[in-house]
Design a protein with these regions (language model features):
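Histidine-dependent nucleotide/RNA phosphoesterase domain, centered on the 2H-phosphoesterase fold
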Residues: 1-249
């Protein structure tokens, strides 16, 4: 089989918005100052991902010379997030629970004020992508998703793009995560003959930040197709170029 082409784009839920920026900026700044300190874990500063890059990846796509990108953008614009979530919640409601509500005489009242966001995310903890924490190259925070609604929503989005032939089908479950540390961005380290990623002993970091809350109850505002390779911004931050996005409403 020919090798799979390198990914050029990804579908994601961006995590940085007007509501989350202050929370994430404070959390990431404190984390950065701690783990990069020579008196603490002495992690190379380049390994800590910039604020503007934080997102939840749904899937990656390959569009050499941008071939197929137009189709992906068109598909994105046909999505109706509210309808997708309504279908998920309808499937979650069992006949037994629906019957119990009717017996109690529960009725749905019209909410006062602005409607609640369709999806909100709390980002918590720190985990190693590698099975051995003492030789980690990627550390990530997980969204709190007790009912599994966020995961099912993202799985529906991924399936839509896979069925259209725009995203490769992977034989592994979707792991929603926000990358906090990735040592691939550390320059000038000897990576050996095979150009392997440098690794860190993350055991102490994982112990310290296992219950750390990065942001809490932040509304998800967009679904986006972004281009691989974060770009430097005028304010010194980094961010991925957005090819197309839709509102989560």
């Amino acid at each position: 089989m020919p090798p799979r082409p390198s990914p050029t784009h990804f579908l994601c839920l961006p995590l940085v918005n007007g509501v989350s920026r202050r929370q994430l900026s404070a959390s990431l700044s404190a984390f950065n100052a701690d783990v990069t300190s020579p008196d603490s874990f002495a992690i190379p500063e380049q390994a800590v991902r910039p604020l503007g890059t934080l997102h939840l990846t749904i899937g990656v796509m390959s569009f050499p010379k941008d071939e197929g990108l137009e189709k992906a953008v068109a598909l994105l614009k046909t999505l109706v997030p509210r309808r997708i979530l309504a279908n998920i919640k309808a499937a979650e409601a069992t006949p037994a629970t629906a019957g119990s509500a009717q017996e109690r005489g529960d009725t749905t009242e019209e909410p006062s004020g602005p409607p609640p966001p369709l999806l909100s995310v709390t980002l918590k903890g720190l985990h190693s992508m590698q099975p051995t924490a003492s030789r980690s190259s990627v550390l990530y925070a997980s969204p709190v998703d007790n009912e599994g609604t966020l995961l099912r929503f993202c799985e529906e989005l991924r399936a839509t793009f896979q069925e259209a032939g725009l995203m490769a089908v992977e034989n592994r479950p979707l792991l929603l995560h926000a990358t906090i540390i990735n040592t691939i961005y550390v320059k000038g380290r000897n990576r050996g003959k095979r150009h392997e990623k440098p690794t860190i002993d993350a055991r102490g970091i994982l112990d310290r930040y296992g219950d750390f809350v990065w942001m809490e109850e932040v509304p998800v505002e967009k679904i986006a197709i972004c281009k691989m390779g974060a770009k430097k911004q005028e304010d010194g931050d980094e961010a991925y170029e957005v090819e197309a996005e839709i509102d989560l409403n």
